[in-house]
């Protein structure tokens, strides 16, 4: 922990969502003077703003959502969704005003050992599963970060957990310096958020910051099946444990037929049956392996690990079975907001798929799905803002229908489907053209499907 004295400092919080509010609350609790700027016009009568001031006997200032907000500011705390090329952040860097992410801010005060999980896909499942394993082993656990409760909200309180299991996005890693986790996991990196980071190379480099400041007493966990994972491992200061579904590893966990074999690098072996995994898809075997390695690093027994995994049925909106109607199975994978996630979802099924894709484009490389569409997909239904771009890239490979909205896409998919088919919502895009977030999109899908019965 690298303590940061912010008492009396004038701190600019950019963005007034869940993370911005939690950051402001923490800063005020530490005696900072908080200034808030948001693209939506806030007023001091805002319920949350006024309550923050009342609770701590200190008013919160409002600033314009522009460069003028930097006047007499000591540091800037941007919400994760504020891109690094935002004019205020670029100007702050130019003026040498520190830019500190919520994650970095929390880590400066965190007194609980942290397991940090990042990757393009699988973060939430892996984070949740690690939390289940540790809880089942008798540990008091905080689970949060990019899911649920922001880490800065946890450090605002008494920090009573034995371990903090934290999902971390590339947005949160953008502005870190002293960040440190005793176990850091990088699940995978496929093309995503290029419109935020500028390039895939920049995105991947930010993801790799999850290993910042690790030493010999820490643990790094990497996917051996990812390109350049061996090169990355050579650059790390911490011991590296690999996981693989395709090949043996010297230290870590790998799949062999119907079991997982864990090697500690010193001759000791442990075995885990594949039958314990209830989650569909080969990608979830990878998530489970990463969770096992993290849990073993915390001293959990194989028995507790197996018990927790056997009872874990997955997370909402991640290839979640919704309903079977007339022999057609409907699955909600609304969390599949990038092309890599769509690929993994398609590979989960052997039955013919009616695939629903669309929403707000994130510069996805849709062409990489072409071979899978030919092999696995019976029909493609495209919806939302991205429908024309998706149509240009992969429309026509299989029978394709374009619709303006998800509601119409669901109806079209039902008309296309026959007994034995799978209707899969795996959008490959963000949800913000129609919905507040991927959860709202997934709930809408399930409501529409259930209304068919």
Curated annotation (Swiss-Prot):
Binding site for ATP: 119-125
GO MF terms held by the record: ATP binding; UDP-N-acetylmuramoylalanine-D-glutamate ligase activity
Pfam family, one: Mur_ligase_M
One Gene Ontology cellular component annotation held by this UniProt entry: cytoplasm
Protein's GO biological process: cell division; cell wall organization; peptidoglycan biosynthetic process; regulation of cell shape
Keyword flag tRNA-binding: no
Coiled-coil region list: none
InterPro entries with a match to the protein in the record: Mur-like_cat_sf, Mur_ligase_C, Mur_ligase_C_dom_sf, Mur_ligase_cen, MurD
Membrane-traversing stretches: none
Biological pathway: Cell wall biogenesis; peptidoglycan biosynthesis
Cellular localisation: Cytoplasm
UniProt-listed Gene3D superfamilies: Mur ligase, C-terminal domain, Mur-like, catalytic domain, NAD(P)-binding Rossmann-like Domain
Keywords: ATP-binding, Cell cycle, Cell division, Cell shape, Cell wall biogenesis/degradation, Cytoplasm, Ligase, Nucleotide-binding, Peptidoglycan synthesis
Keyword Cell cycle included in the entry's annotation: yes
Similarity remark: Belongs to the MurCDEF family.
Function noted in UniProt: Cell wall formation. Catalyzes the addition of glutamate to the nucleotide precursor UDP-N-acetylmuramoyl-L-alanine (UMA).
Alphabetical list of PANTHER family matching this protein: UDP-N-ACETYLMURAMOYLALANINE--D-GLUTAMATE LIGASE
Identification of the protein by name: UDP-N-acetylmuramoylalanine--D-glutamate ligase
Lineage: Bacteria, Pseudomonadati, Thermodesulfobacteriota, Syntrophia, Syntrophales
């Amino acid at each position: 922990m690298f303590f940061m004295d912010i008492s009396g400092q004038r701190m600019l919080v950019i963005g007034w969502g869940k993370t911005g509010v939690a950051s402001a609350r923490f800063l005020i609790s530490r005696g900072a003077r908080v200034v808030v700027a948001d693209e939506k016009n806030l007023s001091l009568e805002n319920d949350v703003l006024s309550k923050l001031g009342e609770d701590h006997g200190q008013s919160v200032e409002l600033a314009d959502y522009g460069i003028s907000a930097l006047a007499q500011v000591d540091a800037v705390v941007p919400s994760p969704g504020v891109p690094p090329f935002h004019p205020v952040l670029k100007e702050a860097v130019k003026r040498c005003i520190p830019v500190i992410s919520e994650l970095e801010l929390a880590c400066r005060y965190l007194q609980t050992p942290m397991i940090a999980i990042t990757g393009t896909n699988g973060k939430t499942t892996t984070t949740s599963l690690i939390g289940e394993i540790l809880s089942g082993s008798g540990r008091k656990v905080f689970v949060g970060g990019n899911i649920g409760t922001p880490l800065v909200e946890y450090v605002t309180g008494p920090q009573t957990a034995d371990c903090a299991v934290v999902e971390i996005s590339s947005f949160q890693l953008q502005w870190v310096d002293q960040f440190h986790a005793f176990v850091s996991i990088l699940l995978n990196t496929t093309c995503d958020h290029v419109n935020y980071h500028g390039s895939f190379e920049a995105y991947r480099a930010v993801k790799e910051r999850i290993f910042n400041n690790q030493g010999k007493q820490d643990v790094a966990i990497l996917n051996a099946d990812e390109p350049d994972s061996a090169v990355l491992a050579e650059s790390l200061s911490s011991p590296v444990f690999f996981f693989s579904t395709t090949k043996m590893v010297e230290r870590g966990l790998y799949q062999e037929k119907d079991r997982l074999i864990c090697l500690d690098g010193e001759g000791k072996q442990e075995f885990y049956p594949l039958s314990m995994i209830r989650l569909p898809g080969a990608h979830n075997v990878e998530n489970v392996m990463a969770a096992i390695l993290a849990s073993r690093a915390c001293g959990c027994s194989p028995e507790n690990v197996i018990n927790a995994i056997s009872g874990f049925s997955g997370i909402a909106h991640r290839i979640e079975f919704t309903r079977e109607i007339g022999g057609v199975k409907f699955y909600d994978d609304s969390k599949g907001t990038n092309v890599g996630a769509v690929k993994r979802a398609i590979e989960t099924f052997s039955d013919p798929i009616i695939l629903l894709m669309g929403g707000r484009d994130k510069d996805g490389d849709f062409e990489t799905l072409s071979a899978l569409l030919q092999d696995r997909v019976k029909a493609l239904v495209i919806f939302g803002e991205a429908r024309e771009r998706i149509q240009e890239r992969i429309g026509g490979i299989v029978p394709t229908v374009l619709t303006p909205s998800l509601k119409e896409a669901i109806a079209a998919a039902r008309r296309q489907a026959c007994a034995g088919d799978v209707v899969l919502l795996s959008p490959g895009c963000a949800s913000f053209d129609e919905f507040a977030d991927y959860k709202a999109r997934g709930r809408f899908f399930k409501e529409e499907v259930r209304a068919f019965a």
